[in-house]
Each structure stands twice: as structure tokens, then as C-alpha cells.
Regions:
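Conserved beta-loop-beta element that borders a ligand/cofactor-binding pocket
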Residues: 94, 98-100, 130-142
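Active-site beta-alpha turn of Rossmann-fold NAD(P)-dependent dehydrogenases/reductases
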Residues: 7, 60, 97-98, 119, ...
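Active-site "gating" loop of Rossmann-like NAD(P)-dependent oxidoreductase/epimerase domains
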Residues: 62-73, 99-120
Length: 142
């Protein structure tokens, strides 16, 4: 299985690479965080089409949530590009989101079935990203 990992230099990327390599069942094709700051859709097309991928694992946004460069509209646009290409090529997509999609106002633990209700800009952007992915893709796991 050929897996494209977006955010290979993230903690999750390092762990995934360390876990998958000894098993030799999966080929990890990694893209570091800085290299995912695409400015044009063409850059994403080249990345996707040059590889014969079985899965896209997107760890970009969960990694940069509390980073120096906050999650914002450029990330939403990049996600649109990725979703469109993954749908066209019929590549399953695994997106790592965050609990930031919830406001934290409930007095009980949140469930997967709870409606995202974030009010902060990062949480709202993550909600928009999840919406873009679920609308564009048949095979999406968030």
C-alpha cells in the first residue's frame, strides 16, 4: 500500500514512519510541513499524479493548530485542491482533525455524533475543512 503522508515531519509522521518501515508492508511517501504550503493547485496535481497512491493521510492542520503559522483560509483552499484531486483519482482520504471543532461548553464529554460548534477562528476553519472533505469525497475518514 502506498500512503501519502502530508506532514511527515510532524510527531505523527515520525511515529508512522518508525512503525511502518520495519513491517515493510506499506510504502510511505512523505511531504514535510513546509512543502505543503502550496501556492497553486498545479503543485498539488504534480504531487498526486506522479504517485500511484492508495491512501492520503493528512496530518497538516492538526500539527500546525498551535504553531507559529495559524490555520486559516489558505489551508482551506489547499484542502479543496487535495479533495478535488483525491475524488478525481478515487484515492481514500484520512484527515486528522482536532477537538478544537467543539467549543468545550458541554458539561459532558463530546461524542463523534455531536455537532461541531466551535466559535474561535481555528475551530471554524477546521469545521469548514471537514465540510469540504465530506462534500467532495466518497471515501473520507475524519
Amino acid at each position: 500500500m502506498r500512503v501519502l503522508v502530508l506532514g511527515l515531519d510532524s510527531p505523527l509522521g515520525f511515529s508512522l514512519r518508525a512503525f511502518a518501515a520495519p513491517l515493510m508492508r506499506h510504502e510511505i511517501i512523505g511531504v514535510d510541513m513546509d512543502a505543503t504550503r502550496w501556492r497553486r493547485e498545479r503543485q498539488v496535481k504534480k504531487l498526486i499524479r506522479r504517485q500511484s497512491l492508495d491512501l492520503i493521510l493528512d496530518a497538516r492542520l492538526v500539527t500546525q493548530i498551535d504553531g507559529v503559522d495559524p490555520v486559516g483560509q489558505p489551508d482551506l483552499e489547499r484542502t479543496r485542491w487535495l479533495a478535488s484531486l483525491a475524488a478525481r483519482e478515487r484515492i481514500p482520504y484520512f484527515f486528522l482533525s482536532s477537538a478544537r471543532v467543539f467549543s468545550g461548553t458541554l458539561t459532558r464529554p463530546y461524542r463523534e455524533t455531536d455537532h461541531p460548534d466551535a466559535t474561535d477562528p481555528v475551530g471554524r476553519t477546521l469545521i469548514d475543512v471537514e465540510r469540504v472533505l465530506t462534500e467532495a469525497l466518497d471515501e473520507i475518514f475524519i
